[in-house]
């Protein structure tokens, strides 16, 4: 048997956005129903290198298919300036659950961007107003691209407002999407008054307050991925309907981690997990039992999302003879 090696371009080409969104939604369902195993994300802190490693293993049973894998990913903030390397680099090993054979080794950085966008799309589908047609984005880095690509799959987005202190990054983003959307630069408040807002920044001091968003804005808070990171002001969070992806991860390192640790925000302020809404155990925004006002999706990123997205990439690549097959285990086949 051969193991398929897939670089970042291979992952990009084979991670079909609609299929990844469906797969990530299926992962939320499996997790909520207890059909997944996902040990807590483990960290190796390396303060001497201003970085850390994270391991994210998972198994999920989606009913008509199952999948297993592990992502090994880092965050080294000095990399771009000192080593001309990305801040975040990831490697995904995707395995056959029945035999444990490593079916694929793929770039986990591109995979993370794809599944992160897909997670925001799932949340947007359930938590935003059904007729949402405008999207604001705070932070014009690499994650902003997949936010727009994925969310546009679940809502008819026409207007896009992007806000970032780096004018060059904003210009690059506008150039990338100018032919598809009415996209322009704007302030945080202009972005926040769109129907949907995605925040994708690594800040530790909140940059979005209640005055910066509309009465019914849905916010995908995607930037916080470590203790101390915090994009949204406490009073905004406390007045919003908060939906999380996982209680343990969100209270430790998600958007709510800072006010939760301080006792400002408690479990009573959390509406529920996204899986509860996807399976119908709690209502989303739509319907007579749905909620109104501002909503926040606190997304820390789950290993089951990586596994679900990796399956999409592997299956499509394998069917279309993409990637580089090699004899990793030396079985001589």
List PLM regions with ranges.
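Short glycine-/small-residue-rich Rossmann-like dinucleotide-binding loops
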Residues: 201-203, 223-224
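Glycine-rich adenosine-cofactor-binding loop
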Residues: 117-120, 127-169
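N-terminal ligand-binding/catalytic initiation module
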Residues: 1-108, 121, 131, 293, ...
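Adenosine-phosphate binding glycine-rich loop
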Residues: 230-333
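Short acidic low-complexity segments
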Residues: 180-194, 204-211
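An anion/phosphate-binding loop that grips the pyrophosphate of nucleotide cofactors and donors
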Residues: 194-195, 240
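Short, conserved loop/helix-junction motifs that constitute active-site signature segments
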Residues: 156, 211-216, 235-238
């Amino acid at each position: 048997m051969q193991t398929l090696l897939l670089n970042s371009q291979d992952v990009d080409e084979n991670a079909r956005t609609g299929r990844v969104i469906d797969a990530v939604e299926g992962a939320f369902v499996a997790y909520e129903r207890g059909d997944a195993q996902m040990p807590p994300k483990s960290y190796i802190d390396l303060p001497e290198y201003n970085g850390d490693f994270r391991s994210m293993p998972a198994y999920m049973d989606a009913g008509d298919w199952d999948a297993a894998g592990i992502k090994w990913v880092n965050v080294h903030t000095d990399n771009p300036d000192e080593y001309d390397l990305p801040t975040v680099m990831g490697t995904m090993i995707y395995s056959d659950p029945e035999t444990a054979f490593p079916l694929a080794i793929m770039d986990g950085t591109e995979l993370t961007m794809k599944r992160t966008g897909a997670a925001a799309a799932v949340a947007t589908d359930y938590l935003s107003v059904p007729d949402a047609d405008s999207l604001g984005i705070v932070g014009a880095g690499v994650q902003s691209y997949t936010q727009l690509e994925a969310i546009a799959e679940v809502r008819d987005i026409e207007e896009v407002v992007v806000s970032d202190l780096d004018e060059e990054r904003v210009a690059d983003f506008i150039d990338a999407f100018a032919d598809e959307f009415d996209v322009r630069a704007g302030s945080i408040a202009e972005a926040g008054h769109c129907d949907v807002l995605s925040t994708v920044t690594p800040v530790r001091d909140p940059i979005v307050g209640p005055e910066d968003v509309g009465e019914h804005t849905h916010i995908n808070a995607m930037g916080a991925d470590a203790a101390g990171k915090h994009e949204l002001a406490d009073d905004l969070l406390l007045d919003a309907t908060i939906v999380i992806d996982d209680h343990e991860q969100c209270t430790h390192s998600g958007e709510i981690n800072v006010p939760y640790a301080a006792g400002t925000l408690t479990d009573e302020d959390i509406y529920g997990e996204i899986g509860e809404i996807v399976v119908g155990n709690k209502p989303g925004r739509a319907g007579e039992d749905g909620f109104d006002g501002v909503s926040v999706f606190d997304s820390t990123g789950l290993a089951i999302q990586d596994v679900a997205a990796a399956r999409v990439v592997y299956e499509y690549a394998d069917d279309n003879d993409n990637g580089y097959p090699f004899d990793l285990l030396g079985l001589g086949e």
